[in-house]
Each structure stands twice: as C-alpha cells, then as structure tokens.
Amino acid sequence: MEDEHVADLLIAGGSADPNLAPLVAAAERAGRSVLSIVHGPEGEPAFSWDLESNRLILDGREVGARGAFLRYDVFTPPVEARGLDRNGGWYAAAMGWALSRPGMRLLNRAMTHGANQKPYMLRLARDSGLATAPTLIANVEADLRAFPAPAVAKPVAGGGYVRPLDAALADAGWREGRSPIPAIVQQRLSYPEHRIYLADGRFHLFEIHSDLLDYRPGRPTSLVYRGAELPWPGVAEALAKLTAAVGIDFCACDFKTEAGRAAPLFLELNSGPMFAAYDLAAQGRLADAIVAQLTQE
C-alpha cells in the first residue's frame, strides 16, 4: 500500500452531477490538488475506512484531505437492486469521514436544523430585516381559498415547483375541508428573479428572467451575473444576519420582484444549491469562490 496522499480538496458525489466539474476546473486554476470519490451506475470506488485507526483507503491508497465538497447525488436513481439507497449510502460514508477529521474545511459545518425549514426561514428572514411576500401556511380549504389573488402555492418542505394557487387547489385531495399536507401560499410576484449566492464570505448576484412561473423546469430566458455587490440598501446586512443566525457560510437565496417596490422580496434559502449554470454565467467566479473557501490556509 502506498503512503498517505493528502489532497487540498476532496470532491465527492455522483458521476452525473454537473456541479462537480466546475469545482475540479477551479481547483486546477488555483493550483490545488484534488481527491475524488465519484460513484455512479458505471462503477464505484473502493472505499474502506477503519474507525479504529481512522484511516481511509481509497482504491488501494491511504488518503486524506484538508477541505471537502460533498453532494448527495440527485441525478442518478437512488435505489439499487435490494431496495437500498445507494446515493444516500455514499453520501453518509463520505460525509461521516469528513466530519470526523479535525480541522477539515466543510461548507456549512455549523449549520443549524432550522436552515432547511422553509417556513421558519421565512419568519426568520422577516426578523432579520428582509421583506417577504404575504404568506399563509395552511391545509384548511376555506383559508386557502380566501387568500387574495393572484397567488401561488409551493411545497412546505420543498422538493417541488411553484404552481398557481387555483391549480393547486383543484387537485389538493381535500378531505373534510383539509388537504393532506400544509402548503406555502404567497402573493404572486414578478420577474426579474434574483439569486444571491454566499461563498467565501461574499455575495454573488444573478438576475433571472423567464416566461414560466417557476423557471426551474426549463431554461430561463436570461441568466446574467451582476457581480458581488447588492444594489439594494440594507439587503446585504440583513442577509448576513439571516445566514449567521443559522450557521450558514454557503447558500443560495432567491428573491423576486413586487411592482412598485425597489428591493426584491425574499423567497427561500437553499443550503445545498446547484450552481453549474450560474458558475458558467459568472465565468468561473462562483466555483473559484467555493474552492477558495474550502482550501484557504
């Protein structure tokens, strides 16, 4: 067996994930060495972590890393022949090893449970000084039908697209005036939509236009990088307060426009966002910032 190889950055995830390649390219630009744990239908690495010695043997070689970027694979069907979650298993193994390494640089290592709770984050955003749209979280048919139009509905726990409220009401599966799951219902806002990434202690602003209510199922009409400065007074300070409150140091926050209001309204925070298309629009600046955050001395 070869002596331990310690890389500057471990990158782990699924072979079909388009977000990994920009990080590898950014690491190469920065002169950082990369260790990969990439799994997928075409093959798996040989992974053996002995907890007694705390040594990781990867493809027959003892390895280590100073920083790590790890993503759960959402691009490959997760269930293998015996009904086990292959993607979850690889993520748990790699993340478990990374978390056990003292001093390992990770994104959002201090993140609290609340960061991934969308209703809580809407309330906390208000408390932090960010404006949000009028919002109702409910499964009561009468209350939802009384919400002022135009309005939209979105899954309370994420994992789905934004829909017109009328369409959501039509197939909600009502039983005795209640739906099976509460929904987030909000005033319908307009484009432009803004996505703000936090990486390496700085914000990165993108402006999005689309003909769709929710641009994510297709491609936006335009996606433009607007730089590292936020043009709305007080938004950067409020967003910094929000992310600090939940231990976030890397994320994407989405905002949308209300007619007559200068600053956009906060929609949600994503603690594990995709970023490949945004990095392309920013000509590599976003991936460069992520690599810098994970490899700086």
Regions found by a protein language model. Give the residues of each.
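Extreme N-terminal starter segment of soluble prokaryotic enzymes
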Residues: 5-10
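Conserved N-proximal alpha/beta basic substrate-recognition cap immediately N-terminal to
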Residues: 14-26, 35-131
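Phosphate-binding site of ATP-dependent enzymes
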Residues: 27, 149-238, 242
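Short acidic-glycine loop/turn motifs at beta-strand connectors
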Residues: 31, 50-53, 198-202, 259-262
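Loop-centered beta-sheet repeat module
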Residues: 114-116, 120-164
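A short linear hydrophobic-aromatic micro-motif
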Residues: 133-134, 152, 183-185, 250-253
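A long amphipathic alpha-helix within ATP-dependent nucleotide-binding catalytic cores
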Residues: 215-266, 278, 287-297
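Glycine-rich phosphate/pyrophosphate-binding beta-alpha loops
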Residues: 270-282
